[in-house]
């Protein structure tokens, strides 16, 4: 993918150096994905569109995070992509939570070789709050339904009432929202995906347990 097409699809202007880091990550991903399962096989040939662009669109919504936590980082989407985009800035950090040791090893390599602003934590998601401090942004992609995600994230939400979530969801997102409202109160902004007509980014804030 060309740098100009990346900019057109995401609305993000990045330096040549940052684009080269993204390109290097894609090459690295290709090598590692031959050995370990990082994403569904059906999407490996569409890495830029299905994964890089899909992840980068979050940064347009939250361009100046101080402490971003990506839950279930897997193949690095959106965690590594966000950390690479943050490398243009003087502050901001991404903590990537991934309990699978092989995937965690890939993520560490990706962060190191791209000079991205992030760190990998090979712990279970439900235990991550014990070692990770307050954050202002949480992301998760293809991880769990909203109710379970909110349960995972509630320790951070209790500490920071201004916590924001950026969550990729598919066509059935509304049923997840409705189910989550049985146990949680929250504000919601729905952003259409830049790639998929039936996919959205849910921007959630003000999360609290229903009384």
From Swiss-Prot:
Keywords: Cytoplasm, Methyltransferase, rRNA processing, S-adenosyl-L-methionine, Transferase
Described purpose of this protein according to its UniProt entry: Specifically methylates the N7 position of guanine in position 527 of 16S rRNA.
Native source organism of the sequence: Allorhizobium ampelinum (strain ATCC BAA-846 / DSM 112012 / S4)
Positions contributing to S-adenosyl-L-methionine binding: 72, 77, 125-126, 141
Descriptive protein name: Ribosomal RNA small subunit methyltransferase G
Localisation: Cytoplasm
GO cellular component terms, semicolon-separated: cytosol
SUPFAM superfamilies the record matches: S-adenosyl-L-methionine-dependent methyltransferases
NCBIfam families (UniProt xref): rsmG_gidB
């Amino acid at each position: 993918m060309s740098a100009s097409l990346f900019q057109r699809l995401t609305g993000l202007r990045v330096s040549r150096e940052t684009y080269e880091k993204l390109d290097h990550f894609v090459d690295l991903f290709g090598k590692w994905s031959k050995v370990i399962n990082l994403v569904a096989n059906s999407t490996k040939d569409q890495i830029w569109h299905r994964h890089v662009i899909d992840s980068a669109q979050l940064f347009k919504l939250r361009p100046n995070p101080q402490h971003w936590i990506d839950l279930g980082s897997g193949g690095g989407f959106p965690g590594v992509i966000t950390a690479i985009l943050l490398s243009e800035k003087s502050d901001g950090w991404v903590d990537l939570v991934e309990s699978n040791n092989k995937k965690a090893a890939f993520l560490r390599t990706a962060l190191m070789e791209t000079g991205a602003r992030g760190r990998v934590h090979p712990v279970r998601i439900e235990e991550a709050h014990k070692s990770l401090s307050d954050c202002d942004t949480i992301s998760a992609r293809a991880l769990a339904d909203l109710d379970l995600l909110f349960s995972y994230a509630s320790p951070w939400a209790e500490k920071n009432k201004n916590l924001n979530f950026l969550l990729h969801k598919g066509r059935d997102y509304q049923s997840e929202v409705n189910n989550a409202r049985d146990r949680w109160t929250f504000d919601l902004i729905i952003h259409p995906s830049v790639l998929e007509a039936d996919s959205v980014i849910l921007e959630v804030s003000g999360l609290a347990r229903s009384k």
